[in-house]
Regions:
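Active-site core of metal-dependent hydrolases
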Residues: 188-291, 295-311
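Histidine-rich, glycine-flanked metal-binding segment
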Residues: 26-28, 32-39, 45-90
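Divalent-metal coordination cores built from histidine and acidic residues
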Residues: 107-190
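His/Asp/Glu-enriched, well-ordered alpha-helical/loop segment
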Residues: 286-368
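N-terminal secretory signal peptides and thylakoid transit peptides that target proteins
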Residues: 2-17
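Di-metal (Zn2+ and/or Mg2+/Mn2+) metal-binding site signature of metallo-dependent hydrolases
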Residues: 86-107
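Divalent metal-coordination and catalytic microenvironments
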Residues: 43, 63, 85, 112, ...
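C-terminal cap of metal-dependent C-N hydrolases
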Residues: 43, 360-402
Length: 402
């Protein structure tokens, strides 16, 4: 006769049935859960942060990158994205965009932009609108607060900084300190129409806010009153010059088309140079080509996209990136400028821009479309290329969103 089970024996055996990983943890015949939630399979994976460029698979689990290697079985994942013949990168990081009710973070996300910084649309007086967009966005959105308290809205012909009463350091600092989770730095536009003769004072005031807090100044250059070397002298390591390939006056080239020595010196001491494509006075083929031929490639590429720019000279971030294939940069160089380098430019993004194991699972998949493609600069000069990046799939925090 079998021995009678005591209550203690019964409780112990019942507990064993509930232990994870035991043979009885799932009903007989039920298939095991897949090892990975999602697999991006068979694409050319370009991860500049890891110096990785090869055909491989990207496996995702729990919203994080779990493995990057060739030959991962499709049966090991719940969902598979077939990326054969396509380019797989970390999610794009666009550090200069202008959001509003029309150009939403969701619109940018559909083009592969999984993180973005609004470049000064909002100042201290209307920062709540930008904060709302950042709070409600699925992708990661941070703000570069305009030193001009009304941002790009409401001042009309006065401009953000033409009247320094609009550049109140105390007011801007309070807005930054109240929203440190979402404000990544200060934006200043230094062109004559926005700052006039106040451009140098604007840099000084912006630095008064950012330097004690370890934040970034992004300065829009081109067509300024003051010479660029005087502006650069006031910028600190980690600060960003945007519109690096803006035409004269007061761009990065001298009258003979040679790179100013002060520009190289600024880079050597840690100032970053960003593209900021935009629509007017920010990027010309001539300046970009001359600078790149002299070895002065951008540190980061950004779109400076606005709602009107979606149909005029900018179009979307992948189109901006594709222009630099035409200008002679390699695809890995371009991807670096829009992922790892862009993420490192702003502390709020430094865990992004990579497919390293454990990183947030933000992934973009592109078709590198071959054929005649027309690209246009800010002067509406058309050049023809042969390759264009076209979004094919986007993964945000491990979930496919395109």
């Amino acid at each position: 006769m079998a021995p009678m089970l005591t209550r203690r024996d019964l409780l112990a055996s019942t507990a064993a049935l509930c232990l994870p990983g035991t043979a009885s943890a799932r009903p007989s015949g039920q298939p095991a859960a897949p090892e990975f939630d999602l697999l991006v399979s068979g694409g050319r994976v370009i991860d500049p942060a890891a110096s990785f460029d090869a055909v491989a698979d990207v496996a995702i689990r729990g919203g994080r990158i779990a493995r990057v290697a060739p030959g991962i079985s499709a049966s090991s994942a719940g969902t598979v994205i077939d990326a054969r013949g396509r380019i797989v990168t970390p999610g794009l990081v666009d550090i200069h965009v202008h959001t509003d009710a029309e150009l939403t973070p969701a619109w940018c996300l559909a083009t592969g932009v999984t993180a973005m910084a609004d470049g000064g649309t909002y100042g201290a007086d209307n920062v709540d609108t930008g904060l709302w967009l950042a709070h409600t966005a699925k992708n990661r959105v941070r703000l570069l607060l305009n030193l001009g308290r009304s941002g790009l809205n409401g001042l009309g012909a006065v401009g953000e900084l033409l009247d320094l009463a609009n550049a109140d350091v105390a007011v801007a600092r309070r807005a930054v300190e109240a929203h440190r989770d979402l404000v990544a730095g200060i934006k200043i536009r230094l062109s004559k129409s926005a700052a006039g003769a106040n451009d140098l004072e604007a840099v000084r005031r912006a630095r008064q806010i950012t330097a004690p807090l370890g934040l970034t100044v992004m300065a829009h250059i081109g067509q300024s009153v003051s010479p660029l070397p005087e502006i650069l002298a006031l910028m600190g390591p980690g600060d960003i010059i945007t519109h690096v390939y803006a035409p004269a006056p007061n761009g990065i080239l001298d009258g003979n088309g040679r790179l100013l020595p002060e520009v190289r010196a600024a880079r050597e001491r840690g100032v970053l140079f960003d593209v900021g494509n935009g629509r007017s006075g920010h990027l010309t083929w001539d300046v970009a080509e001359r600078a790149i031929q002299q070895g002065f490639l951008p540190d980061t590429i950004s779109s400076d996209l606005t709602a009107p720019g979606r149909t005029d000279r900018v179009f979307d971030f992948p189109t901006v990136l594709s222009k630099f294939l035409l200008l002679g940069m390699t695809l890995p160089q371009i991807v670096a400028c829009a992922t790892s380098r862009a993420a490192n430019a702003l502390p709020a993004f430094r865990d992004l821009g990579t497919l390293a194991v454990g990183a947030p699972a933000d992934v973009a998949v592109f078709e590198l479309r071959e054929g005649d493609v027309e690209f246009v600069d800010n002067e509406r000069t058309v050049r023809k290329g042969r390759q264009k990046l076209v979004p094919a799939a986007v993964v945000l925090s491990g979930q496919r969103v395109l």
